[in-house]
Amino acid sequence: MAEKQLSQAAQWDHEFVWHPFTQMQDWLAQEPVVIERGEGVFLIDENGKKYYDGVSSLWVNIHGHNHPVLNQALKDQIDKIAHSTLLGLVSPPSAQLCKELVELAPEGLDKVFLSDDGSTAIEVAIKMAYQYRQQVGQTKKTKFIALNAGYHGDTLGTVSVGGIQLFHQVFHNLLFKPLTLPSPGVYADVADRDKAFEESLAELERILSEEGDEITALVMEPLVQAAAGMLVMPHGYLKRVRELTEEHDVFLIVDEVATGFCRTGKFFACEHEGVSPDFMTLSKGITGGYMPLAATLTTKRVFDAFLGTFEEKKTFYHGHSYTGNALACAVALASLKVFRDEKVIDQLPAKVEAFTKALEPIKSLKHVKEVRQRGLIVGIELEKDVATHEAYRPNDAVGAKVAILAREQGLICRPIGDVVILMPPLASTVEQLEDMVRIVGESIQRATEEEGLLEDLRPIIL
């Protein structure tokens, strides 16, 4: 049989593009899906085939593709100006966006530093927290605490506080070393969940009691450790972490890059436990999935420590060329307007309830270890033998098989190893959510129970 001719875009992709988190040897052996446009919760390829955007284009899309309000905001702004620097000038969209973010954020987060993506937002928080300690005379406070299985980005500072060895171990010699907590979401058996919760908090108490006067901040994802496979933290963990860090004057840096903007059912995941952190980072959904933008929110206490004369050298010397980009800020403002006008958060409880109900039959599938869910975020972990917890071998590529089979039925989902991920746009209807879950369930059943299926696939990691 003659080899199928790739489209021009696919040919150029294979010749010139290096994809993120992708083993390119495997990629170059495949015929890629070329997405030309989007409509609502659907992606549409160059042949006109429609796919549910089951992972919100890597957890960023909120209101669906081609939303008229967001489109119009970009058109209106481009007629004014695309970008002007925030170094020495004011940009109206960025000023208004910072105001609105503060109004939405947990109490006490009064200042906003804009950047470009989740990694930069955390990098800003790490540097601000460290510089603060130096400037107020707490020079011994140089250490950070991070969680095992945490993920905060790909820059060297964020990799330092990351806890996924597969991604980070090659850079070990370039990194600063944090104090590490066991994740409350990592356990061999669901029955061990409470034990994991208690052990993580006990270790935090020990670290703080022994080294608290040397620690700048604790960095964590609230409620869900996303890149580790949607590991859901037990209720009460975040609140207790906040209490302990406050007792020892350790900053809490909360990474809401994936969980922010209603993904968990509330506007910010912190709200579930009434927590106000010292730093909160936002990105992904901030522009509704339209453009790169990020924000690091912090307190007046932190901000005031950077005020002084030039000679005092208290300035925060950090920033990017496109910080506060007018187009990105304009569409972010439009996204917040859609949240208000379309009462997005009011519609979520019914959607989450339907999503939860639709997922219930998947729990009883032969090779499903656990279904982890928070709001419209779900991770379905697969095992070769659930009774003995025997894992699939990496080359079984069971998650990749599920993704390919789901794609054949019109759903784009990207697994993390053997964890099948769904994080659909908030704009999805109940019927669309139920259909996505149906496709995933059928694909899991086929991938795990049919012999000899798609044997040449390799694992997909994030």
Where are these regions (language model features)?
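Conserved N-terminal phosphate-binding loop of PLP-dependent enzymes in the Aspartate aminotransferase
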Residues: 2-462
